[in-house]
Amino acid sequence: MAGLRIIFMGTPEFACPTLRKLIERGEEVIAVVTQPDRPKGRGQKLVPPPVKALAQEHDIPVLQPLKVRTPESVDEIRRLAPDLIVVVAFGQILPQSLLDIPKHGCINIHASLLPRYRGAAPLNWCLINGETETGITTMMMDAGLDTGDMLVKRAIPIGPDEDAQSLHDRLSQLGAETIDETLDLLLAGKLVREKQDDSLTCYAPMLKKEDGLVDWTREPVQVKNQVRGFTPWPGAYTFLDGKTLKLYRVAVAGETGEPGEILRVGREGILVGCGSGSILIQELQLEGRKRLPTAEFLAGFRLEPGTRLGEAGSVEH
């Protein structure tokens, strides 16, 4: 039996397991719509999005409109006559004229338990806010931002030391499993739509680099969660002698000291005063150097207790 005629819309690595799942299921993926190739690295060479590379491996036609909302792009998608559009981390807002094209609508895979954490960076904000559970929601798309009817929800626990990279990888796989379940229900005529309760929502805006600056007056658990949510990108950071110091792995500690003051330096890490306690820095990266476990970093860098971490150009000794 021929599968559904599906257009897949997605861009980063996060979206790839779902596209693979659609191919494995035998659905007829008639096109992939993804963002344009972007210049990367020192040579500014154009690099295709991961979804484009995967589509080309399977000889699936690829469309890369600068703006999918233009009448030309919408008409091109209309001519393909899809039964369904599946969207995962595409990176552009779809106009109503596009949402109306497929007979089964447009299904989005969102990396949170809606209606909580609508927006561009749900898995990061779950970590920053210290949540212990998140998941995947499939939803029927409407013209709002992650406001459509919910279809299938799958929840997973968040580990106490889990960072955004680890959670990204797990949710990416869970997204593929959830679309599998969603399409089975759709084909069986058993898909149930549930309205979102707007009173329960919270927003997860795109991360900005400057949001990663550590405020050492905050409580240790808040700083730890900030580091978890910002690892690996854009990175939580402070300053050491005017240079950016990125923090990739930290632990909460009980000793107290002045906010931002290095209290102790040892193989187990760098202990820094923070709020009503302290933070043990276990993995870091100083500007111009590689990301390293703290013990390896200290083997080639002398750091004295009493040094103050803080804003650029205002480092105290």
Curated annotation (Swiss-Prot):
Biological processes annotated in GO? conversion of methionyl-tRNA to N-formyl-methionyl-tRNA
Task: Give the family, as the similarity comment puts it.
Answer: Belongs to the Fmt family.
Q: Name one GO cellular component term.
A: cytosol
Q: Do you know which HAMAP family this protein is assigned to?
A: Formyl_trans
Q: So where does (6S)-5,6,7,8-tetrahydrofolate get bound?
A: S112, L113, L114, P115
Classification via PANTHER family? METHIONYL-TRNA FORMYLTRANSFERASE, METHIONYL-TRNA FORMYLTRANSFERASE, MITOCHONDRIAL
GO terms of molecular function: methionyl-tRNA formyltransferase activity
- Specify the superkingdom: Bacteria
Q: Looking at the keywords, is Transferase present?
A: yes
Q: What is its EC number?
A: 2.1.2.9
EC class, as a word, reads transferase
Cystine connections? none
UniProt xrefs under Pfam families: Formyl_trans_C, Formyl_trans_N
Quote the function comment for this protein: Attaches a formyl group to the free amino group of methionyl-tRNA(fMet). The formyl group appears to play a dual role in the initiator identity of N-formylmethionyl-tRNA by promoting its recognition by IF2 and preventing the misappropriation of this tRNA by the elongation apparatus.
Native source species? Geobacter sulfurreducens (strain ATCC 51573 / DSM 12127 / PCA)
Entry-linked InterPro entries: Fmt (IPR005794), Formyl_trans_C (IPR005793), Formyl_trans_C_sf (IPR037022), Formyl_transf_N (IPR002376), Formyl_transf_N_sf (IPR036477), Formyl_transferase-like_C_sf (IPR011034), Met-tRNA-FMT_C (IPR044135), Met-tRNA-FMT_N (IPR041711)
Q: Which residues form a coiled coil?
A: none
User: Per the record's keyword annotation, is Calcium included, yes or no?
Assistant: no
Enzymatic reactions: L-methionyl-tRNA(fMet) + (6R)-10-formyltetrahydrofolate = N-formyl-L-methionyl-tRNA(fMet) + (6S)-5,6,7,8-tetrahydrofolate + H(+)
**Assigned keywords, A-Z:** Protein biosynthesis, Transferase
- According to UniProt, the name of this protein is Methionyl-tRNA formyltransferase
